[in-house]
């Protein structure tokens, strides 16, 4: 009897949709699976607000690997782990030697023997891929130079909260169209049926490889995407104006980037160009944002280039359209959903 029960448990674990899987890029999951995770995140957010316990990771140990510094990702994974009953352990760039003094494979095998799940935030996509390949435990991509999948769950969760649906929503991303956020928005939106516009100068538009992948997903979902340097065309009748920092972590070409992207700043004129009613338009930003000179970076840019605001003006950042802090909070709830689904004591047979 015990043997039969054990076999049944093993069979169920194997057949559970999410159990043991890693989230390395959005394309690792089907559109229906992403929609399920978004709805699960909304459910977990409701439980959190009601003070209802949801400790699906009781007794689990989670390694948080950070080559790149972070406020939101670290805070979200830490609080999500604790709420779920797990113990998070932070390992910063001075604690891990990925590919330097120890190979990624060796590190993965060691961490996999001690931890039940691993989050990685860093530079190379190959590192998070290898952590998943060799650790034997679920691995979650907190950000790489190519993709930002945990951000996407929070972003599209925020969109669904505000509009009640994702399909046919128009989202215009303004800025560096080659960075991880732009890549992930284009792919995720195309998977989920949202119409994504990447509004960037020609020098900073997505790669052909990324657009070809988006095209395949868009054909299946019925969504439409647009890559353009024409701001008027890119923001017309949009529902979501989205932007990101002009220079990503690890980059240093501020002067060229400021010159290229200054026309693509999200300001009140951009809002007017959308011609979208106020109740059908929101602004989003994955943060941090340079909307004033109250930071060292902001002050430095002002001293060098004479601009007090970069990718978004302070007026828009503090306007009725702004949802960036709601979006930031949703990092915790959506990360909680992916951790619980892939590692928790849940059985999800299908979606």
UniProtKB/Swiss-Prot annotation:
GO molecular-function terms, A-Z: amino acid binding; ornithine carbamoyltransferase activity
Major site of localization recorded for this protein: cytoplasm
EC assignment: 2.1.3.3
Biochemical pathway: Amino-acid degradation; L-arginine degradation via ADI pathway; carbamoyl phosphate from L-arginine: step 2/2
PROSITE patterns in the record: CARBAMOYLTRANSFERASE
Gene3D superfamilies from the UniProt entry: Aspartate/ornithine carbamoyltransferase
Highest taxon above the source species: Bacteria
Binding of carbamoyl phosphate, residues: 70-73, 97, 121, 148-151, 286-287, 331
Catalyzed reactions per annotation: carbamoyl phosphate + L-ornithine = L-citrulline + phosphate + H(+)
Binding-site list for L-ornithine: 180, 244, 248-249
Amino-acid biosynthesis keyword on record: no
Keywords from the named record: Arginine metabolism, Cytoplasm, Transferase
Top EC class, one word: transferase
GO term, biological process aspect, one: arginine catabolic process to ornithine
Cross-referenced Pfam families: OTCace, OTCace_N
UniProt subcellular location: Cytoplasm
UniProt cross-references to SUPFAM superfamilies, sorted A to Z: Aspartate/ornithine carbamoyltransferase
GO cellular component assignments: cytoplasm
Keyword Transferase: yes
Protein task: Reversibly catalyzes the transfer of the carbamoyl group from carbamoyl phosphate (CP) to the N(epsilon) atom of ornithine (ORN) to produce L-citrulline.
Family per record: Belongs to the aspartate/ornithine carbamoyltransferase superfamily. OTCase family.
Annotated protein name in UniProt: Ornithine carbamoyltransferase, catabolic
Gene: arcB
């Amino acid at each position: 009897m015990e043997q039969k029960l054990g076999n049944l448990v093993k069979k169920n674990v194997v057949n559970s949709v999410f159990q043991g899987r890693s989230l390395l890029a959005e394309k690792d999951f089907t559109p229906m699976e992403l929609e399920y995770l978004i709805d699960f995140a909304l459910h977990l957010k409701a439980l959190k607000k009601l003070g209802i316990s949801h400790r699906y990771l009781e007794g689990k140990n989670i390694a948080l690997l950070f080559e790149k510094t972070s406020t939101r990702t670290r805070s979200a994974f830490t609080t999500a782990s604790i709420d779920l009953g797990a113990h998070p352990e932070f390992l910063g760039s001075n604690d891990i030697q990925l590919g330097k003094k120890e190979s990624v494979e060796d590190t993965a095998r060691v961490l996999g023997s001690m931890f039940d799940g691993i989050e990685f935030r860093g530079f190379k996509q190959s590192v998070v891929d290898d952590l998943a390949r060799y650790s034997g435990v679920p691995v979650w991509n907190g950000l790489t130079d190519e993709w930002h999948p945990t951000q996407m769950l929070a972003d599209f969760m925020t969109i669904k909260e505000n509009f009640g649906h994702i399909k046919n929503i128009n989202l215009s991303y303004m800025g560096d169209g080659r960075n991880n956020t732009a890549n992930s928005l284009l792919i995720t939106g195309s998977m989920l049926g949202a119409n994504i516009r990447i509004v960037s100068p020609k020098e900073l538009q997505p790669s052909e490889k990324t657009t070809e992948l988006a095209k395949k997903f868009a054909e299946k979902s019925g969504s439409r995407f647009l890559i353009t340097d024409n701001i008027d065309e890119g923001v017309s009748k949009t529902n979501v104006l989205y932007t990101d920092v002009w220079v990503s972590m690890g980059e240093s070409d501020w002067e060229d980037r400021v010159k290229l992207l200054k026309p693509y700043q999200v300001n009140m004129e951009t809002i007017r160009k959308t011609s979208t009613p106020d109740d059908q338009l929101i602004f989003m930003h994955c943060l941090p944002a340079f909307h004033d000179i109250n930071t060292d970076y902001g002050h430095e840019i002002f001293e060098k280039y004479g601009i007090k605001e970069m990718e978004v003006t302070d007026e828009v950042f503090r306007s009725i359209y702004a949802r960036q802090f709601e979006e930031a909070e949703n990092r915790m709830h959506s990360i909680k959903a992916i951790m619980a689904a892939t590692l928790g004591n849940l059985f999800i047979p299908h979606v």
